[in-house]
Amino acid sequence: MYSVCDVVRDAVAQSHLCACPNDKLPQCKGVTKAPPKCSVFHVAKLQDTKFKWKYTLDPLKAQKLSQIDKDIEKDAITLKLIYGIELSPEDLEWWKMQRCLINKKTGAKGGQFANKYLERQDLELLGYSPTPIIGGDFMFTALPDKVLRTIPVAWDRFLNPAMMIFFLIILLCVILGIFYVLVRNTLRRKQKSKQHQMEIKRFIKEKEQDPYIHTSFESWPADPNKKWKDLIPMYEAQGYCMADYRKKLGMPPGPNC
């Protein structure tokens, strides 16, 4: 029974013939047709194309996806006739197929497509290679294999230049959101601090006017009629009768009446 990796490695082993017939390629001499096993790469490339069309607003989106599904089905039938097993197209995606490749130098399983891995050059010439992780081949010459093998292969799908714009937009939105929250909270704290300071100033002002304010000895409010009450005895001293005024002001009866 064949596994997905068996099929992938089998296809990679003769991938140099997938561009045939092509008179410019020396390996294509006498080859009139690309091997059916190249269907593995066709499916992988179609899966990439399908992924891109899924997230487009193009009016032809539904029509294009339908055609891609039909093409994938044709290649899946071809592979079934060769290997006698039903392969899921979802298993034949570039980032999943990378798990099946082997490092030429060490024999260890390779995590990423790079020139040092099995037949990557042929795949690039055929246009089948996936978009490399950010940094491209430079990353693979600058970092040791042990480091490279720690990079999850799934990152090849998301950490590529074509997709990074979406992640940068999301990151920018997150940063702006955090900045907005910080600014809003700072302004709220300043507003509360300002209100608190105003309350303190008002309390100090009231305290200066009445030292017993807000205590059990708080002074009675000033009498608005005190001025007139002070004038009445003065008029009475001159012999006037101020009984009516005393009554209106709530004062006891006085002389001269």
Swiss-Prot record:
<keyword id="KW-1043">Host membrane</keyword>
<dbReference type="GO" id="GO:0016020">
    <property type="term" value="C:membrane"/>
</dbReference>
<comment type="similarity">
    <text>Belongs to the asfivirus C257R family.</text>
</comment>
<feature type="transmembrane region" description="Helical">
    <location>
        <begin position="123"/>
        <end position="143"/>
    </location>
</feature>
<protein>
    <recommendedName>
        <fullName>Transmembrane protein C257L</fullName>
    </recommendedName>
</protein>
<keyword id="KW-0812">Transmembrane</keyword>
<dbReference type="GO" id="GO:0033644">
    <property type="term" value="C:host cell membrane"/>
</dbReference>
<keyword id="KW-0946">Virion</keyword>
<keyword id="KW-0472">Membrane</keyword>
<dbReference type="GO" id="GO:0044423">
    <property type="term" value="C:virion component"/>
</dbReference>
<feature type="transmembrane region" description="Helical">
    <location>
        <begin position="163"/>
        <end position="183"/>
    </location>
</feature>
<keyword id="KW-0426">Late protein</keyword>
<keyword id="KW-1133">Transmembrane helix</keyword>
